């Protein structure tokens, strides 16, 4: 597998890497995109954004619209894509995509097996359409802390819905 770590990335670098990783995939590929950073909501437009380090305080050309991210993800040839977004207003990422709204809790084993055969897009977010807790006093957000803890303590194959449920339950309990 290939890994690309972007720390404190600027708009152009972020966009170029997302495009590279979503466009240059084959049908057998799986892709994980993890974003931890600032997010914003443009209330008048009802649009969510990721804010790279060079983004201005008010909406500008350096705000990365969730719509663009959604389009890159939808058009990718990759079989499975998981996006984990730990930012304020991250719940806007998959709103209005036109896809089926499948709550993780409603999925059965049979439907999960069916999804394994199809092209899937899964988004885990640290919250809905609101600000999220930045830190619980540690080095990471409450969401990231539990995500890391769950992955480290797991010693077998973990389905995405189980990871989501574990992190979600913890965050709801402690936020």
Where are these regions (language model features)?
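Active-site-proximal C-terminal subdomain of hydrolase catalytic domains
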Residues: 3, 81-175
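Caspase-like (clan CD) cysteine peptidase catalytic core
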Residues: 9-36, 40-98, 155-166
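A structural preference for short, hydrophobic beta-strand core positions in alpha/beta folds
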Residues: 5-7
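Residue-level recognition of the N-termini of beta-strands and the immediately preceding loop/turn
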Residues: 1, 29-31, 121
């Amino acid at each position: 597998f290939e890994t690309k770590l972007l720390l404190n990335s600027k708009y152009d670098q972020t966009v170029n890497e997302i495009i590279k990783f979503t466009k240059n995939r084959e049908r057998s590929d799986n892709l994980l995109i993890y974003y931890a950073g600032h997010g914003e909501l443009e209330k008048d437009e009802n649009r969510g954004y990721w804010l790279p380090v060079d983004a201005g305080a008010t909406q500008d050309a350096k705000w990365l619209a969730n719509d663009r991210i959604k389009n890159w993800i939808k058009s990718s040839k990759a079989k499975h894509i998981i996006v984990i977004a730990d930012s304020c207003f991250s719940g806007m990422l998959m709103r209005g995509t036109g896809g089926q709204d499948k709550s993780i809790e409603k999925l059965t084993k049979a439907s999960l097996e069916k999804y394994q055969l199809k092209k899937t897009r899964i988004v885990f977010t640290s919250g809905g359409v609101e600000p999220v807790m930045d830190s619980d006093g540690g080095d990471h957000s409450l969401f990231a802390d539990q995500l890391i803890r769950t992955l480290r303590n797991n010693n077998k194959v973990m389905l995405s819905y189980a990871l989501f449920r574990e992190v979600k339950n913890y965050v709801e309990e402690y936020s």
